UniProtKB/Swiss-Prot annotation:
GO terms for cellular component: cytoplasm. Spermidine binds at residues 122-123, 229, 276, 302-304, 311-317. It comes from Yarrowia lipolytica (strain CLIB 122 / E 150). This is Deoxyhypusine synthase. Its cofactor is NAD(+). The lineage of its organism: Eukaryota, Fungi, Dikarya, Ascomycota, Saccharomycotina.
Length: 346
């Protein structure tokens, strides 16, 4: 047989439909070109936009955040309004060096509210008292336990850090209990966090700047970590009195913020509680206008972390016409680049 069989050529050499005029060709970054030398972060991300895969998603995330942070309009009363930006992050990101990037956003009043898990609260405070160190993912747990070293991925936290945290936080809890009993102060997770941010008085702290700039920090699972351990110990120390923390007041507070927003945006690093708490608050206004997810979760197991923005649209947590993207990546790898290309570029 000297000619290619028609069956094969008809299967392989199928003609395409005409390419739409607005189709975007794949492109990359040629560092031989003078304009790509000493590239700024915004230019780098802009060039990555055409690469495909997660590079394109990263570019979309930056475009959405830029629109989110720069939008200006008027509220129902005709007053100037900007996007209410909800920032969510998991505790491991505060344990990592990404804490400095998050602090930058809060210090410069670039977000409106924060949701984190308990570790995201306590680790910020503990880092003001003692260092966290680089380690290795492969370090053996039993050996680390014998030496009093706690592993968070490839980070190491000496257990002495938590002892220092207890010494620092328990007197504050004593004072808060006294204010509850004598002055009738009603504590919520966000007011507890605000008080701790005030007391830490350290400019490296996210919570210090949240207190200073009156940015509420919500943590519906405040007891799920070392701070919960300290609260547990305090119930015995203070018995028969007990510090009471009202979570219902905080759900009203964050939901009310969402409902009052002229536009609402979500920037969520990681998944689980922090992701859903913000999304559910946005449900109260029939969905967010912007959403950027950055995490590595997959949706095949039905997990909240793995769910794409489209699932939140089905629940009314993101508006059907909203601008949204999910970037499948470790936030420590890409979020500094996102911030450099958006919030920090001016």
């Amino acid at each position: 047989m000297s000619e290619t069989p028609n069956l094969a050529t008809e299967a392989v050499l199928v003609h395409s439909a005409p390419v739409p005029e607005d189709a975007v060709p794949v492109s990359g970054i040629d560092f031989d070109k003078p304009e790509n030398k000493n590239t700024r972060a915004a230019d780098l991300v802009g060039a990555m936009n055409g690469m495909g895969f997660q590079a394109t998603s990263l570019g979309q995330a930056c475009n959405i955040i830029d629109e989110m942070r720069t939008w200006e309009g008027v509220d129902k009363e005709g007053n100037p309004a900007k996007t209410t930006i909800f920032l969510g992050y998991t505790s491991n990101l505060i344990s990592s060096g990404l804490r400095s990037t998050l602090k930058y956003l809060v210090k410069n009043k670039m977000v409106s509210a924060i949701v984190s898990s308990a570790g995201g609260i306590e680790e910020d405070l503990i880092k003001c008292l003692a260092e966290t160190y680089l380690g290795d993912f492969a370090l053996k747990g039993s050996v680390l336990r014998e030496t009093g070293m706690n592993r968070i991925g490839n980070l190491l936290v000496p257990n002495d850090n938590y002892c220092k945290f207890e010494e620092w936080v328990v007197p504050i809890l004593d004072t808060m209990l006294e204010e509850q009993e004598k002055q009738g102060v009603s504590w919520t997770p966000s007011t507890v966090i605000d008080r701790l941010g005030k007391e830490i008085d350290n400019e490296d702290s996210v919570l210090y700047w949240a207190h200073k700039n009156q940015i509420p920090v919500f943590c519906p699972a405040l007891t799920d970590g070392s701070l919960g351990d300290m609260l547990f110990f305090h119930t015995f120390k203070a018995s028969p009195l007990q510090l009471k923390i009202d979570i219902v007041a905080d759900i009203r507070k964050i939901n009310s913020m969402s409902m009052a927003a002229t536009r609402a945006g979500m920037i969520i690093l990681g998944g689980g509680l922090v992701k859903h708490h913000i999304a559910n608050a946005c449900l109260m206004r029939n969905g967010a206008d912007y959403a950027v997810y950055i995490n590595t979760g997959q949706e095949f197991d039905g997990s909240d972390a793995g769910a794409r923005p489209d699932e939140a649209i089905s629940w009314g947590k993101i508006k059907a016409g909203a601008k949204h993207v999910k970037v499948y990546a470790d936030a420590t790898l890409v979020f500094p680049l996102v911030v450099a290309a958006t919030f920090a570029k001016e």
